[in-house]
């Protein structure tokens, strides 16, 4: 392949000149002679010049430096060799456990599966978290988004889902850390090792592969690391496995695109995002899907800037998801964790034909009661509880019990709360809320329902309070 030379370097964007008859293709990987740095071609400007994004720091680059065209897109190791390992965007190991075997590699850019290869799923994925299982159940092979502003518990919820699903899950998991804190990546690795999901002695017996492009990395790495993780998940799916794919945080993927978009010469669109936002998001999300061979169940954390769900980035993500779990600052401020908003959160699975009539009726009864309580709160704030009709007073009492019963101690938060984590089966969840809605537990104080697992625990707690 022909060599080129750097003609311009602005931050993470580098222009390279090649002979006119040997211009690299879009998405080709370029290597710098005598260095680990990889560049990815984004645009062909004409006259032999291509505009690239550096997947690494561009410090020390200068005009005239020699760049080699590999002739291929970025490829990363896939298959069993990736299990138990921590890799970067290029598939290089960053866990100090030696090189990753390159028996099989795959390009991080590929087309989404054809329509006739797709396999829709109706099976439910039980999470053990009451509020999620009740009002926004997950589908096996579906896509789930955890939406929330800063500090309302996206990562803690994600870790609890990993704890409840990945540890009990017989298949494999891939975790992509996109632009998040390095500390969280480190904690996750050690937690997985303690739970034997990562086998430190025989990594190939592990059940999880980890790919990190943390917030201290250049934008090129953060832009591509989700694709690297997805490529590894697709390889397992194509072998006939059921894969869990966790992404924390999909917003940073968008943000990395925004950072380089202006440098690539594109006009910004709404709120300064890249004009190609919907296309980039679609290209990633359309690949996260289940085929007749195997399934990918994806759980993605989505940061919501300034708690504004109408911001273009979360709004674009909404369109691709089967279930949306919305975390609310108002609920967190009441001390109710997980701070999931049962009125804002939705799921395509919450349909009597999928979950069954009993589950559906219970979920709608809970949502109806909480919605009515929300409407009455203004009256209570102005006139007080005494001005309410007797039936409304009863409804408010039940709604407050439901609200508290939606809280639950988490396994991953045991060290902070001192309370042992609880996993609640779907059957127990439905039974508990049915009893509250029917009025069977009207005689119990509302404190008894706070931070417990099953309804039996709430009844026991009420006895102690008395």
From Swiss-Prot:
This is ATP synthase subunit beta. The gene is atpD. F-type ATPases have 2 components, CF(1) - the catalytic core - and CF(0) - the membrane proton channel. CF(1) has five subunits: alpha(3), beta(3), gamma(1), delta(1), epsilon(1). CF(0) has three main subunits: a(1), b(2) and c(9-12). The alpha and beta chains form an alternating ring which encloses part of the gamma chain. CF(1) is attached to CF(0) by a central stalk formed by the gamma and epsilon chains, while a peripheral stalk is formed by the delta and b chains. Disulfide bonds: none annotated. InterPro entries: AAA+_ATPase (IPR003593), ATP-synt_VA_C (IPR055190), ATP_synth_F1_bsu (IPR005722), ATPase_a/bsu_AS (IPR020003), ATPase_alpha/beta_chains (IPR050053), ATPase_F1/V1/A1_a/bsu_N (IPR004100), ATPase_F1/V1/A1_a/bsu_N_sf (IPR036121), ATPase_F1/V1/A1_a/bsu_nucl-bd (IPR000194). It catalyses: ATP + H2O + 4 H(+)(in) = ADP + phosphate + 5 H(+)(out). Its EC number is 7.1.2.2. Produces ATP from ADP in the presence of a proton gradient across the membrane. The catalytic sites are hosted primarily by the beta subunits. Keywords: ATP synthesis, ATP-binding, Cell inner membrane, Cell membrane, CF(1), Hydrogen ion transport, Ion transport, Membrane, Nucleotide-binding, Translocase, Transport.
């Amino acid at each position: 392949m022909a060599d080129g030379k750097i003609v311009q370097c602005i931050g993470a964007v580098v222009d390279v000149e090649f002979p006119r008859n040997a211009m690299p293709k879009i998405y080709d990987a370029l290597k710098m002679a005598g260095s680990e740095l990889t560049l990815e071609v984004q645009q062909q400007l004409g006259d032999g010049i291509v505009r690239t994004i550096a997947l690494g720091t561009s410090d020390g680059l200068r005009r005239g430096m020699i760049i080699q065209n590999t002739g291929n897109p970025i490829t990363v190791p896939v298959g069993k060799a990736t299990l138990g390992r921590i890799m970067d965007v290029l598939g290089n190991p960053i866990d100090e456990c030696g090189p990753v075997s390159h028996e099989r590699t795959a390009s991080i850019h590929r087309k989404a599966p054809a329509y006739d290869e797709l396999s829709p799923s109706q099976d439910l994925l039980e999470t053990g978290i009451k509020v999620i299982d009740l009002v926004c159940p997950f589908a096996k092979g579906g896509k789930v988004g955890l939406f929330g502003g800063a500090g309302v518990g996206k990562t803690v919820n994600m870790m609890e889902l990993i704890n409840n699903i990945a540890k009990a899950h017989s298949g494999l998991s891939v975790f992509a850390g996109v632009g998040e804190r390095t500390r969280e990546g480190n904690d996750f690795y050690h937690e997985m090792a303690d739970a034997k999901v990562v086998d430190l002695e025989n990594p190939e017996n592990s059940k999880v592969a980890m790919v990190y492009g943390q917030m201290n990395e250049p934008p090129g790495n953060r832009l591509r690391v989700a694709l690297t993780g997805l490529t590894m998940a697709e390889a397992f799916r194509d072998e006939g496995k059921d894969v869990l794919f966790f992404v924390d945080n999909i917003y940073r993927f968008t943000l990395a695109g925004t950072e380089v978009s202006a440098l690539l010469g594109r006009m910004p669109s709404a709120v300064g995002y890249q004009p190609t936002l919907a296309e980039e998001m679609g290209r990633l999300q359309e690949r996260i899907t289940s085929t007749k061979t195997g399934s990918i169940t994806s759980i993605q954390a989505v940061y919501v800037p300034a708690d504004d769900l109408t911001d273009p980035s979360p709004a674009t993500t909404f369109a691709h998801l089967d279930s949306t779990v919305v975390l609310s600052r108002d609920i967190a401020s009441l001390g109710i964790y997980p701070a999931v908003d049962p009125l804002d959160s939705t799921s395509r699975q919450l349909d009597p034909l999928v979950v069954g009539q009993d589950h559906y009726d219970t979920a709608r009864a809970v949502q109806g009661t909480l919605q009515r309580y929300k409407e009455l709160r203004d009256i209570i704030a102005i006139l007080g509880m005494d001005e309410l009709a007797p039936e409304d007073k009863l409804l408010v009492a039940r709604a407050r019990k439901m609200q508290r019963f939606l809280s639950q101690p988490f396994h991953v938060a045991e060290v902070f709360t001192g309370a042992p984590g609880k996993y609640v089966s779907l059957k127990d969840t439905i039974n508990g809320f049915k009893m509250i809605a029917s009025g069977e537990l009207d005689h119990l104080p509302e404190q008894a329902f706070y931070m417990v697992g099953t309804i039996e625990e709430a009844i026991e707690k009420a006895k102690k309070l008395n």
